[in-house]
Amino acid sequence: TDSVRDYFLAEVWINNKWDWPGKNWSMWKVQNTDSSNEYADGKWRFMFYDIEFGGVSGEGDAWTNTMKEDNYKPKGLLDTDTKNPAVLSFAYLMSNEDFRNDFNDRLLKMSEGTFEKEKALDRLAEFESIYSPLYEQFFARYPDTGSAEEALHGGYASSDCIRAFINKRDKSIQSIVDWTNSQF
């Protein structure tokens, strides 16, 4: 259950929507267990990939209730009638009060820990310093796809959009928790 919880916590906090959770989710496990490795116990675990939609729409998406508005169903990620096995697993776990309380507490705390604003902004600046020098080369190779200036300061998916999302997302998390609790 920890894998499900932690995976959905991150996906919800970053508001990775559009093509998740309908697709772009996967699970893994080892075939041969190894007692010296806590992740080599043979249990299935969710894994992240293709999360590029998280936070890229900027400030407006910071206010999205990802629990409610994902999965294209009236109850979003809490829909127990879905055919999506990832969402179905999560929805049933959320029907357990202890799991739900733990999930909600951890979601609120992510704004103070893993996704604390200054830490996330510092990480974004670190990525900008690594990748910005490559932008001119990239856009020269792929003309008519944008520019270095747009990648940093343009609209959708620019660094500025991600920065705006990071600056506001923590303020919306309580409303996500409140909505989630109102469903039970």
Residue ranges and their predicted role:
Residues 1-22, 26-184:
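Middle-to-C-terminal accessory/interaction subdomains
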